[in-house]
Swiss-Prot record:
Broad EC category: transferase
Gene Ontology cellular component list: cytoplasm; nucleus
Main location class: nucleus
GO molecular function: mRNA (cytidine-5-)-methyltransferase activity; tRNA (cytidine-5-)-methyltransferase activity; tRNA binding
Gene: trm4b
Active site positions: 323
InterPro entries xref list: MeTrfase_RsmB-F_NOP2_cat (IPR049560), MeTrfase_RsmB-F_NOP2_dom (IPR001678), RCMT (IPR023267), RCMT_NCL1 (IPR023270), RsmB/NOL1/NOP2-like_CS (IPR018314), SAM-dependent_MTases_sf (IPR029063)
Reactions it catalyzes: cytidine(49) in tRNA precursor + S-adenosyl-L-methionine = 5-methylcytidine(49) in tRNA precursor + S-adenosyl-L-homocysteine + H(+); cytidine(50) in tRNA + S-adenosyl-L-methionine = 5-methylcytidine(50) in tRNA + S-adenosyl-L-homocysteine + H(+); cytidine(60) in tRNA(Asp) + S-adenosyl-L-methionine = 5-methylcytidine(60) in tRNA(Asp) + S-adenosyl-L-homocysteine + H(+); cytidine(61) in tRNA(Asp) + S-adenosyl-L-methionine = 5-methylcytidine(61) in tRNA(Asp) + S-adenosyl-L-homocysteine + H(+)
Role summary: tRNA cytosine C(5)-methyltransferase that methylates cytosine to 5-methylcytosine (m5C) in tRNAs at position 49 and 50. Trm4a and trm4b methylate different sets of tRNAs. Also methylates cytosine to m5C at positions (60, 61 and 62) in tRNA(Asp).
Subcellular location: Nucleus
Organism: Schizosaccharomyces pombe (strain 972 / ATCC 24843)
Protein name in the entry: Multisite-specific tRNA:(cytosine-C(5))-methyltransferase trm4b
Length: 685
């Protein structure tokens, strides 16, 4: 769904700005009354639906469940924040304290029945606002609409799964997917359980068609510090095949390198939509809503869904979701895709999953109506050249709809549990799709006819070999993005880093890469999982790679003073320091001599000051005792923060520290220091 930036206000005066928007749209009400959304329910059900559509949307957030201190953070929030948020009054209205979302696993999601503007402006809620901002920046929580949390929960991901998020920006669901992967692998944190990252063989590929929105994903991903995410930029409806290594048969003399098309275990298709389930936060929709928008979106949504099903493994699952209530964008798209795939795909019954989640079944019938609420029985009846109708927009006969089990789709309405409106369908692929069975005129005029999957699998090898003759060794030189170029493990810089930090031989040093054409480590060195590397190297100039990997090492300028001290002490200094993003992943593989313990008081001084002098640390503190033993250059500070010592929660902190002759510095950006300070001390020291 496109961004909506127009500011508006509530009631006959809207609630979050000065321009006036009346929260009424007779066309919208008439349209959905004719659709008979609540068939078989009391007559006042539609009134309740409209009442909640006019209410401000609550603020919701979830705690990242795979984090090593997720439950400590939950307990901390409930102990130190929830009690102080009782009896809060804003502009005469009582704001209830935060409560747990009952259907979210492990009680790790919360709802605050106040919109974000109120939380930002209300003095009693300022402390909550600081908590939400700092923990979100630190990657410990995600501020996310409640219904938006649902699609990843329905996918049931496993650590070995390769997952595609087709329309990923802004990235909250992408983050949720990688969190789910780690949680299933019993990894409490990619950062703090990195030796177990070997058990995570999978990868999340996050795609978005808009280059700017694809860049929005980068912020979400950087917070996670995961080596198992790759961002790409393509039109989801024409997503290119991605290759990986295939089998390598031998002709007796030579081994022949083959590639195969990567098929995904799980796919999320949270497609562009009219967004009419988001009236509660996008108030401009009250005056902009148009029934006709569904007609223009339906073909794109169908193309994306069918392309996703083509990319899905047999036995794999795809979740199709929208923040729309319109059946033309929901059940009609799912029905058309099921019919087009000729029985190779079926809807999964998820009615028992998340048992506390209130939902309605998918609609088995609906009307095709335009802005004037004129009903069409077929595309032939359309005389309006401003809209295009296709057969796929109509429901099939009742018997066929029942056979397809369209009721297995899930509809969520705002009045059910104080959320936005949402639609979810889970589809499983049981057989290869014979793409020749598609009738493009029947479904959408722009749908491409493709050969059957098994034939396509065989023929693309030749195409790829032909195109590879003109490619360079560096990934992505055809596109504007800086290429991903892997570094030879015997490179001088890598050998220096490995020797200096004593990196364990079990660490895969062939998975380091840089983002420049030369392949020389001139500034930053990144790391990603083995499948990430395989995809980069097998899809040179075919796939537009945007971002991925974790920054592990950064080149550090060594001052002349430090060089002189180093010579005097007869000890080397490595000109690559460990970056804060990668410190926790690489730490288990480093020599213990690079770790130095410090207390909370020491950490507070380091957070508060740039390059504090050694004399600023307490004589009784651990850091001053460790200082003389600490080699010049980069080391790792280890702080075991405990509530008994004054920390807000128990947590182990590992951060890079740079030791100079008479001072040391915590190698964190100012914003990172602020977040760490708020997390540990409840204030920006």
């Amino acid at each position: 769904m496109g961004k909506r930036n127009k500011k508006v206000t509530q009631g006959k005066r809207a609630y979050n700005d000065k321009s006036e928007i009346v929260l009424e749209n007779k066309q919208f009400e008439g349209y959905y009354k004719k659709q008979n959304l609540f068939r078989g329910k009391p007559n006042d059900e539609f009134d309740s639906f409209m009442e909640y559509m006019r209410k401000p949307l609550p603020t919701t957030f979830r705690i990242c469940g795979y984090r090593h201190h997720a439950f400590e953070l939950k307990n901390h929030f409930e102990k130190y924040y929830v009690p102080s948020l009782k009896n809060v009054v804003h502009e005469g209205q009582t704001i209830p304290p935060p409560t747990v979302l009952p259907w979210y696993p492990d009680g790790l999601a919360y709802i605050v029945d106040a919109q974000k503007d109120v939380i930002r402006k209300s003095p009693p809620l300022k402390r909550l606002q600081r908590f939400l901002v700092s923990e979100n920046e630190a990657g410990n929580i995600n501020r996310q609409e409640a219904v938006s949390m649902l699609p990843p929960l329905f996918l049931d991901v496993e650590p070995h799964h390769v997952i595609l998020d087709m329309c990923a920006a802004p990235g909250s669901k992408t983050a949720q997917l990688i969190e789910a992967v780690y949680k299933k692998a019993n990894i409490k944190d990619a950062a703090h359980d990195s030796k177990n990252l070997k058990s995570v063989e999978g990868l999340v590929i996050a795609n978005d068609a808009d280059p700017k929105r694809a860049q929005m994903l980068v912020h979400q991903i950087n917070r996670l510090n995961s080596p198992n995410i790759l961002v790409v930029n393509h039109d989801a409806s024409t997503m290119p095949n991605i290759y990986v290594k295939g089998s390598s048969p031998s002709d007796g003399l030579n081994v022949i390198e083959e590639k195969k098309i990567l098929k995904f275990d799980r796919i999320l298709a949270d497609v562009p939509c009219s967004g009419d389930g988001t009236f509660r936060k996008n108030l401009s929709l009250w005056r902009e809503w148009s029934a006709n928008s569904a007609f223009s979106l339906h073909p794109l949504q169908l193309r994306i869904l069918i392309r996703g099903l083509q990319l899905l493994k047999v036995g794999g699952c795809l979740v199709y979701s929208t923040c729309s209530i319109n059946p033309i964008e929901n059940e009609a798209v799912v029905t058309a895709a099921l019919k087009a795939t000729g029985g190779a795909v079926s809807l999964v019954d998820v009615s028992k999953k998340l048992p506390l989640l209130k939902r309605d079944p998918g609609l088995l019938s609906w009307k095709v109506l335009d802005d004037s609420l004129n009903e069409f029985q077929s595309p032939a009846e359309n005389t309006n050249d401003k809209i295009e109708l296709t057969e796929s927009m109509w429901p099939l006969p009742e018997e066929e709809m029942s056979k397809l089990h369209i009721e297995r789709c899930a509809r969520l309405y705002p009045h059910m549990q104080n959320t936005g409106g949402f639609f979810v369908a889970v589809l499983q692929k049981t057989d290869p799709i014979n793409s020749r069975s598609f009738d493009p005129k029947k479904y959408t005029a722009s749908m491409e006819i493709l050969p059957p999957e098994n034939k396509r699998q065989r023929t693309e090898k030749g195409v790829d070999e032909a195109s590879n003759s003109t490619l360079t060794k560096s990934g992505n030189s055809y596109f504007d993005e800086e290429p991903f170029v892997y570094i030879n493990p015997d490179d001088t810089s890598i050998k220096t880093i490995v020797d200096f930090y004593g990196i364990d031989p079990s660490f895969p040093r062939d998975q380091f890469f840089v983002r420049n054409q030369s392949g020389i480590p001139v500034r930053s060195i990144y790391f990603a999982c083995s499948l990430f590397k395989e995809i980069i190297e097998a899809n040179t100039n075919r796939v537009k790679f945007v971002h991925g990997g974790v920054r592990f090492f950064v080149k550090q300028e060594i001052s002349q003073l430090l060089k002189d001290f180093s010579l005097k002490a007869n000890k080397d200094i490595c000109n690559f320091r460990i970056h804060s993003n990668g410190v926790n992943i690489i730490s288990p593989f480093l020599n213990e001599k690079h770790f130095y313990d410090a207390g909370l008081k020491d950490l507070k001084i380091l957070v508060k000051n740039e390059y504090p002098h050694v004399e600023q640390f307490s004589e009784s503190g651990m850091l001053k005792k460790e200082f003389e033993k600490m080699p010049l250059g980069c080391n790792i500070l280890r702080v075991d923060a405990q509530t008994k010592d004054g920390a807000l929660m128990d947590m182990l902190i590992l951060q890079p520290i740079w030791r100079s002759p008479t001072s040391c510095n915590l190698m964190l950006a100012r914003k990172e220091k602020q977040n760490l300070s708020l997390e540990l001390f409840g204030m920006d020291v």
